[in-house]
């Protein structure tokens, strides 16, 4: 019985069991909830984002990189200044980069809103973070030593972004 408790089983039968006992346990099984608009983030290999198995596209390519950086930070708040430094390594922080970052944020929220997922980003004054509890991510599964995360790791992490090289 202790093993069943450790497994977090939703039912348990002791022998001898009747057909009625089995039927009752089957009727009371806890099924995993199906998530509508399930967001899956792939970090191993090239970074990509999927909703219900389909890759989503952003209006601007840098928006995807912005989201990738938030994923990489694993829920830690990131300032606008840090985002500018990462997205435009050599550029001075000026009106142009500030304006473009605002456009990227708008693109991010507009695209996520189309899929009813705008709540995955936590906004505060001058900071942004990813709510890691609302996404499924191969990298997070890997860090948690989940078998699917271990299997997904192929030696490359967000290979299209130079800043990601030192993360894994």
What are these regions (language model features)?
Residues 1-11:
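Alpha4 helix (beta4-alpha4-beta5 surface) of REC/receiver domains from two-component response regulators
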């Amino acid at each position: 019985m202790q093993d069943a408790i450790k497994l977090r089983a939703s039912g348990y039968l002791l022998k001898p069991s009747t057909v009625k006992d089995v039927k009752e346990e089957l009727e009371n099984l806890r099924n995993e909830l199906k998530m509508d608009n399930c967001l899956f983030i792939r970090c191993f290999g090239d970074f990509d984002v999927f909703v219900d198995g389909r890759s989503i596209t952003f209006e601007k390519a840098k928006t995807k990189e912005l989201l990738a950086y938030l994923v990489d930070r694993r829920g830690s708040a990131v300032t606008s200044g840090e985002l500018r430094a990462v997205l435009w390594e050599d550029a001075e922080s000026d009106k142009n980069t500030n304006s473009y970052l605002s456009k990227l944020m708008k693109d991010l929220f507009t695209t996520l809103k189309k899929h009813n997922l705008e709540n995955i980003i936590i906004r505060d004054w001058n900071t942004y973070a990813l709510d890691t509890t609302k996404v499924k991510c191969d990298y997070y599964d890997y860090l948690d030593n989940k078998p699917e995360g271990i299997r997904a790791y192929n030696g490359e992490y967000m290979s299209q972004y130079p800043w990601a090289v030192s993360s894994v």
